[in-house]
A protein has these predicted regions:
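C-terminal ends and interior cores of transmembrane alpha-helices
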Residues: 89-131
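Residue-level signature of mid-helix packing/kink "hotspots" within the transmembrane helices
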Residues: 32, 61-69, 184-185
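Cytoplasmic helix-loop-helix junction between adjacent transmembrane helices
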Residues: 141-181
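Extracellular/periplasmic helix-loop-helix junction of adjacent transmembrane segments
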Residues: 37-65, 112, 116-123, 130
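Extracytoplasmic
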Residues: 15-50
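Helix-loop-helix hairpin linking two adjacent transmembrane segments in secondary transporters
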Residues: 176-215
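Helix-to-loop junctions at the C-terminal end of transmembrane segments
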Residues: 67-79
Length: 215
């Protein structure tokens, strides 16, 4: 292999590493949208309590843990590129779907606006019904999100094994892993602002669409 070809291949590897970093950043931002919007924006509409939120986050962790058991095998079976793209598509779709939970709950309960849901008397049978339906809707979206997000690290690790020589694998792995910390820091700086200015639904949509853009 000529020096020029070797140099191009080396540069290409680091472009791939940058893409892995971005994907991991988006991965961690997607999962934090709910935690940063539920208290001030979602709970008043759906009459959630801390118990409702705890149920959703607890089951998401269980979904994610179980999905991790199969994600690596799925990537091996599908191939790195196809498996990674499917994982990103699934988690991005799950993220965007959260935005429709309010509309679906409104239709199922026969209300004509989201504001009408908010105006229901707290503690009433109607409020309990709204909370129950919305929790199930969000759980469905969290399940899809968890299944997709579980594929990120197995796929990213396999990419580094396939594209990087042993001498660079630890460093490239450290770079894409840092996306988790960057995503955790970027989310609180951006998501509440999006929710306040555009509505919590758009926070889910915009962050979710970043995954589609990556693809």
């Amino acid at each position: 292999m000529s020096p020029i070809t070797t140099s191009k291949m080396s540069n290409f590897r680091w472009v791939i590493c940058a893409l892995l970093f971005i994907a991991t950043t988006v991965n961690y931002m997607d999962r934090q949208v709910l935690s940063l919007t539920w208290k001030d924006f979602i709970a008043p509409e759906f009459h959630w309590t801390d118990d409702h939120y705890g149920t959703i986050t607890g089951l998401f962790s269980i979904f994610y843990a179980i999905a991790n058991l199969f994600a690596g095998k799925f990537v091996d079976w599908m191939g790195t590129k196809k498996g990674y793209l499917i994982a990103i598509f699934v988690w991005s779709t799950g993220a965007v779907m959260h935005a429709g939970c309010g509309w679906v709950a409104m239709q199922m309960e026969g209300y004509d606006s989201i504001e009408a849901l908010r105006m229901v008397q707290a503690g009433s049978d109607a409020a309990v019904a709204i909370a129950t339906i919305s929790v199930w809707l969000f759980l469905s979206c969290r399940l899809i999100l968890a299944v997709g997000e579980a594929g990120n690290f197995p796929a990213a690790i396999k990419v580094t094994a396939e594209y990087f020589p042993k001498k660079d694998r630890a460093f490239s792995t450290a770079i894409f892993n840092s996306g988790a910390s960057v995503g955790a820091l970027a989310a609180p700086a951006t998501i509440p602002l999006l929710a306040r200015s555009l509505g919590w639904e758009w926070a889910f949509i915009i962050i979710g669409v970043l995954g589609y853009v990556w693809m």
